[in-house]
Regions:
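C-terminus-biased signal that marks the final domain/tail of proteins
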Residues: 1-206
């Protein structure tokens, strides 16, 4: 009896019209970023396009993935393509054609880092960001702790820059409508806090 290989995408996925706006383009961009040299991603002769129904179900990235890579992918808005709503490529039609991964309705992002080379008590780190991913920043938390600094530990009922959640919400509200003039400042904020997070983790490990 002839059989065909099991295809999990066909078995568990869908190919609806809404997928071609909300889901498939995001899978295309993630794989385009993590596997840029595996295939041709752009142009009329691209192996896969944003609406292709045969984008691989899973694939191994071309290099080891960092915390920053995960943050970039989950904050992405089709940078470097005509589909970026903040970009200058394409036109008004293409810039609003597909739903981005990073959107203003996001509330929080968590990235789990398991470090097998560390003792059990400090092996895991949970990197957390609050608010809209294109404008927020990741900070590291050790899960095996009893208390967290007040600035980080909750979401207050009062909007204030003295709370990490609301500080990132405020940044997004101020920068979303002025992306081109504020993106460099947001990127510096993300890089500085990320570097400080890695430095604090390294100091704690010592």
């Amino acid at each position: 009896e002839n059989t065909t290989p099991f295809n999990p995408r066909d078995a568990f996925g869908s190919h609806s019209d809404s997928d071609h706006v909300y889901n498939t383009p995001r899978a295309w961009y993630m794989q385009r970023f993590l596997n840029p040299y595996d295939e041709v991603w752009d142009g009329p002769d691209a192996d896969h396009k944003p609406t292709s129904d045969d984008i691989p179900w899973a694939r191994q990235p071309e290099r080891k993935v960092t915390i920053e890579d995960i943050k970039y992918v989950l904050s992405s808005h089709y940078q470097g393509t005509p589909f970026d709503p903040y970009g200058q490529l394409g036109d008004e039609r293409t810039r609003h054609m597909y739903r981005t991964i990073g959107i203003n309705r996001q509330s929080q992002l968590a990235v789990m880092q398991i470090r097998p080379y560390r003792p059990q008590a400090s092996r895991a780190i949970q990197w957390m960001a609050y608010g809209s991913n294109p404008f927020n920043t990741l900070v590291p938390f050790f899960p095996n702790v009893d208390t967290t600094p007040a600035y980080l530990e909750d979401t207050t009922t009062r909007v204030t820059s003295e709370n990490f959640y609301w500080a990132n919400r405020i940044i997004a509200a101020l920068c979303d409508g002025a992306f081109r003039s504020t993106s460099n400042a947001v990127e510096r904020y993300q890089e500085k806090t990320g570097a400080m997070g890695h430095r604090l983790v390294a100091a704690t490990d010592e």
